[in-house]
């Protein structure tokens, strides 16, 4: 760990269409090689598809999907006397959101739909209903923490 003073959290500007910092952060995570306008096009296109399929505001469905993906606990490796234990720890609020976004993006990219807009829209819809691969990842994370509950006293 650094001995210097801790890094200052930068404030992120909200996006133009929904005026939301969460959406802006998601677009930044979605962006590849600095192509922000492409990432915005993908996200807004996906939200249009979601709105067409659900007749609900797309950003509302997106936020519901993120809430369904946020993990409460995760495991961290801790080495004690030559043995490595998977110790369950509670996840900080900002990390919960970051993990949910990361999982949503990565499992969207793995889907079989034609365009990234369609892939993202399908994964958001699935996650908002509590299904899909991203939700499965969250449940696996929770299951792993539950299985290693015996090592919780090794927390640091």
From Swiss-Prot:
**Native species of this protein?**
Gemmatimonas aurantiaca (strain DSM 14586 / JCM 11422 / NBRC 100505 / T-27)
Query: What are the BP-aspect GO terms?
Result: translation
Among Pfam families, the record links this protein to:
Ribosomal_S7
Protein name as annotated: Small ribosomal subunit protein uS7
For this protein, the record's InterPro entries field holds: Ribosomal_uS7, Ribosomal_uS7_bac/org-type, Ribosomal_uS7_CS, Ribosomal_uS7_dom, Ribosomal_uS7_dom_sf
PANTHER family (alphabetical): RIBOSOMAL PROTEIN S7 (PTHR11205)
| GO CC terms | small ribosomal subunit
Q: Which family does it belong to?
A: Belongs to the universal ribosomal protein uS7 family.
Highest taxon of the lineage: Bacteria
Which gene is annotated as encoding this protein in its UniProt record?
Answer: rpsG
Gene Ontology MF term list = rRNA binding; structural constituent of ribosome; tRNA binding
Q: What does this protein do?
A: One of the primary rRNA binding proteins, it binds directly to 16S rRNA where it nucleates assembly of the head domain of the 30S subunit. Is located at the subunit interface close to the decoding center, probably blocks exit of the E-site tRNA.
* Disulfide bridges in this chain: none
């Amino acid at each position: 760990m650094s001995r210097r003073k801790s890094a200052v959290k930068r404030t992120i500007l909200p996006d133009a269409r929904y005026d939301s910092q969460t959406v802006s952060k998601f677009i930044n995570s979605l962006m590849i090689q600095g192509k922000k306008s492409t990432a915005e096009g993908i996200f807004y296109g996906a939200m249009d598809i979601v709105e067409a399929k659900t007749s609900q505001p797309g950003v509302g469905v997106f936020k519901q999907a993120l809430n369904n993906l946020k993990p409460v606990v995760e495991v961290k490796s801790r080495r004690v006397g030559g043995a490595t234990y998977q110790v369950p720890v509670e996840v900080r609020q900002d990390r919960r959101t970051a993990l949910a976004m990361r999982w949503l993006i990565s499992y969207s990219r793995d889907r079989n739909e034609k365009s990234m807009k369609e892939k993202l829209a399908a994964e958001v819809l699935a996650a908002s209903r509590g299904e899909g691969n991203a939700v499965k990842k969250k449940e696996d994370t929770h299951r792993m923490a539950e299985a290693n509950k015996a090592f919780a006293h090794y927390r640091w």
